[in-house]
A protein has these predicted regions:
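C-terminal helix-coil-helix/basic helical segment that borders enzyme active sites and/or dimer interfaces
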Residues: 51-59, 354-433, 568-609, 613-631
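A glycine-rich, basic-preceded beta-loop-alpha segment at the flavin cofactor/substrate interface
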Residues: 16, 253-292, 312-337, 497-513, ...
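A short core secondary-structure module
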Residues: 186-236
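C-terminal amphipathic alpha-helical interaction region
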Residues: 513-675
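Amphipathic, small/basic residue-rich leader segments at the start of a protein or domain
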Residues: 1-117, 137-147, 368-412, 416, ...
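Flexible, small-/acidic-enriched active-site or ligand-binding loops
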Residues: 232-266
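N-terminal glycine-rich flavin-associated loop
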Residues: 113-135, 139, 164, 179
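Glycine-rich phosphate/cofactor-binding loops in nucleotide/flavin-utilizing enzymes
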Residues: 2-18, 101, 414-419, 443, ...
Length: 675
């Protein structure tokens, strides 16, 4: 590849709403745009003032913090979590909408975003799996301005105190038993639960609780809705002394109440004198967490993206006002940006932020498409073992279509579309949570370091230090990194997904800018990863232990880490490609499309080079580190690895270009929210 000798136009200002609406696919969704406007106004006024006025200095839940919920109600953020027929904002699936609203709030503070987000989490079991009566009752009560005169708030309690908090969602110490069961009447249930680190418990009016049977008259596990006024003990517990997320309330409740059996989420039947829930707690959790984890990943992406402008401003103004630094001089105009180290490192932060955002909104759109067809597909596929058997044929067809270069999502058979989308979602969702919050927190530390000593002060512009510390909790919220790695390691071997990996590799190679935006490197890395996964699935180490065994975390977990980064770069490429195909017709974006694409492709090359190199390192450790590969396999691997190395050509030029753009891109004179 030849170095660029002709100056290319680059991004003149940081991307605005017009660009983001195209890239993230909501240019035609006026309802989402209005919801974003409400969330942005709330975040950059009410939320920002709370942070600036020191409300993060205490873990106690104050009246000032409580005002957040009034602001959420007034802006439409509360209604965004509800069905339209119950006072909600959106008709149909709303995963993308909720992710975008969460993104806007987390742009300022992740704790405030969590306070808004937790209502969606609490309502999740009811919205996804509840009976029609349960959905109508609780969604109506949670709608601002409902007939009761009070907007209900929710909470969610899954696991128990140590040692299993947030890790093993199958371990439940909460118990449900029959308190009273009169002939011809509805059974009354005793619910006993001790929760740990339960968000929003201080103010919730209801809580969705996961329980296991403590009575021979009750079979299996379930989830139950408990209201704060139910007879018995509803002790909200002491406030958790958190060092992060201080704009959300957290406690360790002790609950021992009696509720009617109609509160069992999803309903129940009675068989031979035994209450049998229609849904186990794990069935509900699998459905809910598969989507709500994305919101946490999006929070990490927003934190990263919000750091770009404050760091640029700090770098450029660092020496202004100093003796001898005259207006018009390079030092006055560029400050620290006269040296490339700071812009090179910031380019890494920016590229990571773009990829993390793209990954979060990519999986959000996938879930919207799944919701549109899942009822029809599940009806055809059946349940349990019958469903597993019925999925075989559509999975085989999806693999065949991908091999032929066709899109299974366009197939007329709804079951083919469903198994295809689920194969992708089951990897992208935990990848978003893992990469955006885990790797994202590491990259956020780089952003903090670029602010010098200012970065660890209370008045750091953009509240960057708070965001960095908040991201430590984000990485464990709704399951720590081990949980995400575990899910990826279990789902990345799906033959439909593996066929899609090859299809993505071909798509990357077909990119017109593949020789300069890292797509050749990404394609080579995807193939290297797939080969290594197949190798590990059958290879054994010197002790005769299989490398790819599900409990061999020293192998499958690093492979999950590698895949998550590759998925982020893949999603970013899809967004840049969509902008290239559709942005030209936009009256604002069109005239500047070339400059936007040049810079986005430079950022894409930056992140593609990073994740491809990391994936190659991990794969090499798997193949060579356990002495499991014979000479033939080593040669195969080395040939694929060499393709990755050669394909990195141009990725550092892309990073140079992205770094240079950071010295010229225009930013506002000051942040649009208080410090």
């Amino acid at each position: 590849m030849e170095e660029n000798k002709v100056e290319r136009p680059t991004m003149k200002m940081l991307p605005g709403d017009e660009v983001r609406q195209i890239m993230w696919r909501f240019a035609e969704r006026y309802d989402i745009q209005m919801a974003i406007a409400g969330a942005r106004q709330t975040a950059r006024s009410v939320v920002a003032r709370l942070v600036a006025n020191g409300q993060r200095f205490t873990h106690e839940w104050t009246p000032e913090k409580q005002s957040l919920f009034d602001a959420f109600d007034a802006s439409g953020m509360t209604a965004a979590t509800l069905n339209a027929d119950c006072g909600g904002l959106f008709e149909g699936p709303r995963n993308l909408a909720m992710s975008l609203v969460t993104y806007e709030t987390a742009w300022v503070d992740n704790g405030a975003a969590t306070s808004s987000f937790v209502n969606d989490l609490a309502m999740g079991p009811i919205a996804e799996m509840g009976t029609p009566e349960q959905k109508t009752k609780y969604m109506t009560l949670c709608a601002p301005g409902n007939p009761s005169g009070k907007t209900w708030r929710g909470s969610f309690a899954l696991t128990e105190p140590l040692p299993y908090v947030g890790v093993d969602t199958g371990v439940l110490c909460g118990r449900v038993s029959v308190a009273e069961w009169k002939d011809g009447e509805e059974p009354m249930l005793r619910v006993e639960k001790r929760g740990r680190f339960i968000t929003n418990i201080e103010i919730c009016d209801y809580i969705t609780i996961a329980l296991d049977s403590g009575d021979e008259r009750f079979k299996g596990s379930c989830m139950v809705v408990v209201e704060a006024t139910d007879p018995g003990k509803f002790d909200r517990g002491a406030q958790t002394k958190k060092l992060v997320h201080q704009l959300s309330n957290t406690g360790d409740p002790v609950i021992d109440v009696v509720v009617p059996a109609s509160r069992i989420i999803g309903g129940y039947t009675v068989k031979d004198g035994v209450i049998v829930p229609n849904l186990s707690h794990s069935e509900i959790i699998a459905q809910v967490f598969s989507k709500t984890r994305v919101g946490v990943g999006v929070m990490g992406a927003a934190s990263l993206m919000s750091a770009i402008e404050p760091v640029i401003r700090y770098q450029r103004t660092r020496f202004r006002g100093a003796l001898g630094v005259n207006e018009g001089s390079p030092r006055h105009a560029l400050g620290l940006q006269m040296k490339e180290d700071v812009t090179q490192r910031l380019a890494d932060v920016w590229a990571t932020a773009e990829a993390a955002s793209s990954l979060g909104f990519d999986i959000s759109r996938v879930y919207d498409r799944i919701e549109a067809i899942q009822d029809e597909a599940k009806e055809k596929l059946g349940k349990g073992r019958a469903m597993l058997k019925a999925m075989k044929a559509p999975m085989e067809k999806a693999v065949q279509l991908l091999a032929e270069g066709k899109n299974p999502e366009e197939d007329e058979d709804v079951t083919v579309r469903y198994v295809y989308l689920m194969a992708i979602a089951n990897v992208l969702c935990p990848s978003c949570k893992l990469w955006n919050t885990g790797h994202g927190a590491d990259v956020m530390r780089q952003a903090i370091s670029l602010m010098g000593g200012y970065g660890i002060t209370e008045d750091c512009p953009g509240f960057l230090f708070y965001k960095w510390t908040d991201m430590q909790l984000d990485a464990t919220y709704e399951g720590p990194e081990a949980v995400q790695r575990r899910q990826i390691s279990e789902t990345m071997g799906n033959p439909v997904f593996l066929a899609q990996v090859e299809a993505w590799a071909k798509e990357c190679e077909a990119c017109p800018a593949a020789d300069r935006n890292g797509m050749n490197a990404l394609a080579a890395a995807l193939r290297l990863w797939a080969w290594t996964r197949d190798f590990a699935a059958t290879a054994k180490d010197a002790a005769g232990k299989k490398l790819g065994a599900s409990q061999r975390h020293g192998v499958v977990f690093p492979m999950a880490d590698a895949l998550a980064g590759l998925m982020a770069a893949k999603s970013f490429h899809a967004d840049v490609k969509h902008l290239a195909l559709t942005g030209g017709d936009h009256p604002v974006v069109g005239p500047e499309l070339e400059s936007y694409l040049n810079t986005f492709n430079d950022l894409l090359g930056t992140i593609a080079g990073n994740v491809a190199g990391e994936a190659a390192r991990i794969c090499a450790e798997v193949v060579f580190g356990f002495n499991a590969a014979d000479a033939e396999k080593q040669a195969e691997f080395c040939a694929l690895r060499a393709k990755v190395d050669v394909s990195l050509a141009g990725t550092k030029i892309a990073k140079d270009n992205a770094a240079k753009c950071l010295t010229t891109v225009m930013i506002p004179e000051a942040l649009d929210y208080p410090m």
